[in-house]
């Protein structure tokens, strides 16, 4: 793994990368400004924004934080890099699912080849669709690695099984069960994909301060967060939430033993220290 941006490279090598996603369809400059400011305060690794050159130029004019642009349109990604984007992502497919648009492995690979042709010197991340069966996700991840992709990102969804677990967790007020159930699809993808590729894998979709540590123990090199930040009303609350995620990735709170059982590494928990902003 060799990313061109030194900050990104260092964070992924240390497996502490935090990506804050403003939303692939979020063109609200006021809200994006709040997210950028919160990222700067908390020192998030980078931000993921809509593929709009004007938004990219605006962010680069007010901040030094690395900018990722997400789209499935190669031309839009190319124009965003010309505007200053540091890396691009083919993904964040959630908004397409609601419109009944589902990309196959072959379609994703075709888009990747076009983007690599247009942007041979730009770091590229690809999201692995959660709608694919796990063995299909693994195949796609291996194929993308062979094509020279730099980063992979997982997705997740709420299945019938996880929804039952969520209801159970709410009933008994079990935050750990609730958090891992919210993220179970993304976590299973992280665990499976990270075993077969040497690329950094970003865990996204349903990840919070509890499940972030689980994701790292499962092989993730970074965490992607979106709705939990964007739904907050002010910069301080956004910054506090990002701080929580950074703490979760800075301490190995969970680990996997030789029998592949998850346990809490309580020796690494600090109960006497907190940060106040």
Curated annotation (Swiss-Prot):
It is found in: Plastid, Chloroplast. The keyword GTP-binding does not apply. Signal peptide: none annotated. Keywords: Chloroplast, Plastid. The keyword Plastid applies. It comes from the Eukaryota. GO terms for cellular component: chloroplast. Its main location: plastid. Belongs to the ycf23 family. This is Uncharacterized protein ycf23. The gene is ycf23.
């Amino acid at each position: 793994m060799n990313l061109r941006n030194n900050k990104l490279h260092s964070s992924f090598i240390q497996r502490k990368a935090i990506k804050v996603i403003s939303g692939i369809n979020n063109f609200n400059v006021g809200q994006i400004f709040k997210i950028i400011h919160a990222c700067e305060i908390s020192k998030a690794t980078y931000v993921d924004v809509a593929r709009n050159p004007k938004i990219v130029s605006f962010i680069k004019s007010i901040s030094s934080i690395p900018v990722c642009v997400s789209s499935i349109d190669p031309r839009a990604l190319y124009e965003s890099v010309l505007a200053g984007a540091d890396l691009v992502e083919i993904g964040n497919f959630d908004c397409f699912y609601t419109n009944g648009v589902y990309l196959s492995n072959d379609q994703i690979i075709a888009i990747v080849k076009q983007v690599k042709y247009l942007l041979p010197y730009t770091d590229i991340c690809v999201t692995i669709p959660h709608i694919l069966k796990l063995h299909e996700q693994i195949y796609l991840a291996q194929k993308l690695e062979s094509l020279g992709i730099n980063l992979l990102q997982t997705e997740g969804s709420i299945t019938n099984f996880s929804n039952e677990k969520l209801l159970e967790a709410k009933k008994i007020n079990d935050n750990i069960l609730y958090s891992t159930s919210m993220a179970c699809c993304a976590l299973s993808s992280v665990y499976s994909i990270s075993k077969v590729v040497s690329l950094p894998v970003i865990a996204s979709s349903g990840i919070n301060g509890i499940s972030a540590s689980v994701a790292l123990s499962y092989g993730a090199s970074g965490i992607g967060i979106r709705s939990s930040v964007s739904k907050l009303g002010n910069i301080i609350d956004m910054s506090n939430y990002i701080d929580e995620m950074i703490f979760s990735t800075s301490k190995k709170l969970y680990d996997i033993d030789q029998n592949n059982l998850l346990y809490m590494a309580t020796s690494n928990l600090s109960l006497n220290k907190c940060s106040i902003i």
